[in-house]
Regions:
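Long, amphipathic alpha-helical coupling/dimerization segments that relay conformational signals between
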Residues: 2-31, 42, 82-162
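Charged, low-complexity surface segments at secondary-structure and domain boundaries
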Residues: 34-40, 65-70
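TRNA-binding/sensing appendages of the translation machinery
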Residues: 37-59
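Short, well-structured alpha-helical interface segments that form or flank functional binding sites
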Residues: 45, 49, 53, 76, ...
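Structured interaction and signal-relay segments at domain junctions
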Residues: 54-55, 59-89
Length: 162
């Protein structure tokens, strides 16, 4: 019997995964996914800056210093947070995504980090992403509103999945 994998849109068997459409979230319509796909290269180009600002922000909090007190911890945060943010803009909410989010949650729990701290840090990342959207969209207010709305939606989905 084939193993079954549940995603947001479908239940797929291992045999048809290669040809099945990539799973996504029902709240992400085609227009939202398109905006996020267009914004992903902006994030990718500036990911090192985004992560550096994130690390500077969280290292000021005693509760977050546990994760940023060693070179190994910083390297891990830099790598994993950067990868995670870029993956969000791919809108791939599949079994791999949920496994990664689960591992991140376990790492937070193991470090004794309460949700209020990492959610607060995520709020700062959201601020940085909105700043990038402002740069990206320029004077096009309608596009900016749509892009920020798409960013908010994908971040909300991610936070709810943790």
């Amino acid at each position: 019997m084939a193993a079954r994998i549940k995603t947001f849109e479908t239940v797929e068997t291992r045999e048809n995964l290669a040809v099945a459409p990539a799973p996504t979230h029902p709240e992400l319509d085609a227009g939202t996914r398109q905006l996020l796909a267009e914004f992903r290269p902006v994030v990718e180009q500036r990911i090192d800056d985004v992560i550096a600002e994130f690390l500077q922000y969280v290292s000021a909090w005693p509760e977050m210093r546990l994760l940023t007190q060693s070179a190994e911890g910083i390297a891990c945060l830099r790598r994993e947070q950067g990868r995670h943010l870029l993956n969000l803009f791919s809108c791939q909410f599949d079994a791999g995504y949920f496994a990664r989010v689960s591992r991140m949650g376990q790492a937070h729990e193991k470090a004794g980090l309460e949700p209020r701290w990492y959610l607060g840090a995520y709020g700062h990342v959201l601020k940085i992403l909105v700043e990038l959207a402002i740069e990206h969209c320029g004077d096009d207010a309608a596009r900016l509103l749509a892009t920020v709305s798409a960013i908010n939606r994908v971040v909300e989905i991610d936070m709810a999945s943790a």
